[in-house]
Amino acid sequence: MGARFSRIAKRFLPKSKVRILMVGLDGSGKTTILYKLKLGEVVTTVPTIGFNLETVEYKGINFTVWDIGGQEKIRKLWRHYFQNAQGLIFVVDSSDSERLSEARNELHRILTDNELEGACVLVFANKQDSRNALPVAEVANKLGLHSLSKRCWLIQGTSAISGQGLYEGLEWLSTTIPNKPERSTSVSSFRSDSYERKLVRGPRY
């Protein structure tokens, strides 16, 4: 009886709202990921000129996800969306090793912006279903993630087509992003390298 009442009550409780910015190089699969999370299916996409905005509900949290185009000429506009972002999803194509240095430069460039100082960083190492996909640990090294010693981050292997790893990423965001602005963001030293080609964790706030 009590459990049933609890389930009913949750339907009427206000949902937490979290603002997420999703960026990455063009062709990394950002928009496919967004609509896989939103609709549960793969949709036909075209290169994003501007942005896509959708709300994804997960475990009582409304994630407002801003998917920003990744073409080089658009990247200088990313900073206009940084304000009030509580989480950053950075999507990389694990199968395109030639562009990982470019992705690294863009990631570290935007993380110097004060507007993203408190944002948790979730890296989706996408296209893990590709024959040419690099192991997640190698992607993490090429992106220089272990140098982000003062920031909360996680890299998650994903496939936008099958949905592999996407909800694991949302789970991490839902348990990591502070629900209240005044909550402390001090670092507690934590890192686990048991990833099985899927997961590499950074320090947990």
From Swiss-Prot:
GTP-binding protein involved in protein trafficking; may modulate vesicle budding and uncoating within the Golgi apparatus. InterPro entries: P-loop_NTPase, Small_GTP-bd, Small_GTPase_ARF, Small_GTPase_ARF/SAR. SUPFAM superfamilies: P-loop containing nucleoside triphosphate hydrolases. It comes from Arabidopsis thaliana. GO terms for cellular component: Golgi apparatus. Keywords: ER-Golgi transport, Golgi apparatus, GTP-binding, Lipoprotein, Myristate, Nucleotide-binding, Protein transport, Transport. A lipid is attached at residue 2 (N-myristoyl glycine). It is found in: Golgi apparatus. It comes from the Eukaryota. The lineage of its organism: Eukaryota, Viridiplantae, Streptophyta, Embryophyta, Tracheophyta. One of its GO terms (biological process) is vesicle-mediated transport. Belongs to the small GTPase superfamily. Arf family. GTP binds at residues 24-31, 67-71, 126-129. The keyword Transport applies. This is Probable ADP-ribosylation factor At2g15310. GO terms for molecular function: GTP binding; GTPase activity. Gene3D superfamilies: P-loop containing nucleotide triphosphate hydrolases.
